[in-house]
Amino acid sequence: MHLSSSNTPSVFVAWQDLASREWHTVARLSQVEDHFELGFTHGADRVGDIARRLFNSTLEQNYYSDQLTALFRNKIPPRSRSDFRKMANWLNLTGDESDFELLGKFGLIPGTDGLLVYPSPKVENGRYSVEFFVHGIRHTHGEAEAHHLHGDVLKWCSEIEPGDSLCPLLDVQNPADPNAVALRAEHGTILIGYVPRFYAADIRTILSRTALARTARITVLKNNHDAPLQMRLLCRFSASVPDDFRALDDSDHKMKAEEAAFL
């Protein structure tokens, strides 16, 4: 069995190195008709024995199963949970989506296992779009307070409304990620946080092309006042792209193997 095509609904798995706090894309999970296919990406090469520790497998094989494994099921809170609807609302969901659709959204919430599950951006009719939580609000605020700079970022977060815009800044001298894209308030110089690392290369590529950058928008979808900071601001980035634009077209997202085995 061959791993799914690029048109198949897919999510990627990212693992956080607690020492460096960097996120590394390590696998892709796809829903293909009545089963699921899991394969490792070249990003997993950066993090040693992650395949064995998390999946009890090797990097050289792909796997399939007829249901979501426990690692992924546990990312989706039970619909019977008392705060399920509240959490779904944080993610701009109705709660009636399929389990795979819920995984692609609830997976954006960091867990104690150090994993995130995030969906592939949509590229349809010449338009690129992706939704994400702003990363690094806590880290940015902590640094700001320590240096007495932009200590009002949390005050700003309390006032932002859905429909408001954020402005991207290409952080070309970022030592952790040369593709880093910082986000600031539309008015003023308040640094809010960052685009998630796994979407940054795409967004940087788009913003680096003047004609495409003019069409780009970063819009606040949800300001979750009752959520932890890492789930505070849900945003959407959208822009016009050429018909041949390929989302997540970098080595970290490329698959290591072609054949699938039973998981």
Language model: regions and residue ranges:
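Conserved active-site motif detector
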Residues: 1-263
